[in-house]
């Protein structure tokens, strides 16, 4: 539209073929992400297929009256075919769908600059735990951890996450060098990323008089949140 304002749009499509498929639960390893213990001696074959596609829109404003910014929105789908006979595509662990980023700086008088970066990430899919199976004493003792309910693989979705970072710079131009000082505050809103809750074994058996194959541990839910406000200051010298 002008010399300082630019827009662009890009689409993409990628097809995956002959990816490892678990013979234990008939789920493609590539769709499990990093939380499912996909490394090891699990039996697999190369029959999984998938796809990733989407659209990215970008706007750039170049140094007009001291303001520069880049904003982008991405819609992305990442899916693999269900290997359990349905033939339907199911979301992979990377299927966040909506991604928005904005970063901008504004030049103030007397060599001051202020900048901001905003990120909004859509919630990733996840697989619920099979709490009923996990609470069985024999099942928990066999694995030492929770079991996923693969019949509901990636059927739930985490909440979106938003993070705002702020930075203020001051530059001093001296005779023989340039001195820059800055204050940077990451996650100034102190946003918390809500992860999938887990359950821990308390050690208490709820029904100790029942047959061993029916005994259950008491499991306690534990909420998981990450993210903290992180301020920092710094100096930069250029000769």
What are the language-model segments listed below?
Residues 12-15, 34-128:
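Gram-negative outer-membrane beta-barrel transporters
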Residues 4-7, 66-69, 111-114, 175-179:
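Repeated loop/turn-to-beta-strand initiation elements of outer-membrane beta-barrel proteins
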Residues 119-143, 159-163, 170-239:
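C-terminal beta-signal and adjacent terminal beta-strands/loops
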Residues 20-26, 33, 76, 80-88, ...:
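Outer-membrane beta-barrel translocator domains and adjoining extracellular loop/strand segments
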Residues 1, 55-61, 71, 102-106, ...:
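Residues on the lipid-exposed face of transmembrane beta-strands in outer-membrane beta-barrel proteins
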């Amino acid at each position: 539209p002008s010399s300082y304002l630019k827009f662009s749009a890009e689409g993409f499509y990628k097809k995956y073929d002959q990816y490892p498929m678990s013979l234990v639960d008939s789920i493609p390893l590539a769709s499990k992400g990093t939380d499912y213990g996909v490394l090891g001696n699990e039996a697999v074959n190369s029959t999984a297929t998938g796809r990733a596609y989407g659209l990215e829109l970008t706007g750039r404003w170049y140094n007009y009256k001291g303001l520069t910014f880049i904003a982008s929105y991405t819609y992305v789908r990442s899916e693999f075919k269900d290997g359990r006979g349905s033939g339907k595509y199911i979301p992979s662990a990377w299927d966040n769908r909506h991604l928005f980023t904005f970063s901008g700086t504004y030049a103030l008088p007397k060599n001051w600059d202020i900048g901001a970066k905003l990120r909004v990430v859509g919630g990733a899919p996840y697989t619920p735990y099979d709490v009923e199976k996990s609470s069985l004493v024999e099942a928990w003792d066999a694995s030492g951890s929770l079991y996923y309910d693969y019949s509901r693989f990636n059927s739930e979705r985490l909440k979106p996450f938003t993070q705002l970072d702020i930075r203020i710079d001051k530059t001093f131009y001296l005779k023989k060098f340039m001195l820059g000082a800055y204050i940077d505050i990451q996650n100034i809103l102190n946003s918390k990323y809500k992860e999938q809750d887990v359950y821990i074994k308390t050690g208490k058996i709820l029904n100790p008089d029942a047959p061993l194959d029916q005994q259950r541990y008491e499991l306690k839910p534990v909420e998981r949140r990450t993210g903290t406000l992180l301020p920092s200051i710094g100096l930069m010298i250029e000769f």
